């Protein structure tokens, strides 16, 4: 079983590349932490110069569970798109709404409330989501990059 990781060079804003790792490689040793959040994807034999942007694949729920167990998901500074929990069109519309509202931040509103509040009918690819330039999209936290 494998997990696909989208990566961004630590000195650049744009998406650089993706890699696929076996789930046996996904563990706390992959990451550096600061203030409880993932700061850097840090495995030299793979891509030591990159941040983890987001992940997808058959084992997304398993990987999500592992991140939660590390108390990293809610505080990470990287983009994490929960593409199996929320359809991609939902994510796109939410990001567009936040952009229109001058990147308002909703710390006290959970993701489901935001999803229900807007009509969500657009489509987006993983690459487009990353290129929108947001540094955080997880558990109801939406923030401009």
Feature roles, as predicted:
Residues 28, 52-54, 80, 103-105, ...:
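Hydrophobic transmembrane signal anchors and adjacent membrane-proximal interface regions, especially
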Residues 111-145:
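Acidic, proline/glycine-rich low-complexity IDRs
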Residues 1-27, 143-145:
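Short, extreme N-terminal segment that most often corresponds to the first beta-strand
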Residues 80-124:
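Mature, soluble, non-transmembrane domains
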Residues 64-67, 71, 95, 99, ...:
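Residue-level detector of alpha-helical secondary structure
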Residues 4, 12-13, 40, 45, ...:
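Context-gated lysine
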Residues 11-13, 21-23, 56, 90, ...:
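Intrinsic-disorder/low-complexity, polar/charged segments
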Residues 26-91:
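Structured domain cores in non-transmembrane regions
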């Amino acid at each position: 079983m494998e997990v696909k990781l989208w990566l961004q060079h630590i000195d650049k804003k744009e998406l650089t590349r993706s890699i696929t790792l076996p789930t046996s490689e996904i563990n706390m040793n992959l990451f550096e932490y600061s203030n409880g959040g993932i700061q850097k994807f840090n495995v030299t034999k793979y891509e030591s110069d990159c941040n983890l942007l987001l992940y997808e694949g058959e084992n997304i729920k398993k990987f999500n569970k592992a991140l939660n167990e590390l108390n990293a998901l809610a505080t990470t500074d990287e983009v994490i798109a929960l593409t199996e929990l929320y359809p991609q069109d939902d994510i796109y519309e939410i990001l567009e709404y936040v952009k229109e509202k001058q990147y308002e931040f909703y710390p006290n509103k959970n993701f489901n409330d935001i999803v229900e509040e807007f009509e969500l009918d657009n489509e987006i690819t993983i690459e487009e989501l990353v290129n929108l330039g947001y540094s955080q999209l997880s558990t109801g936290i939406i923030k401009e990059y």
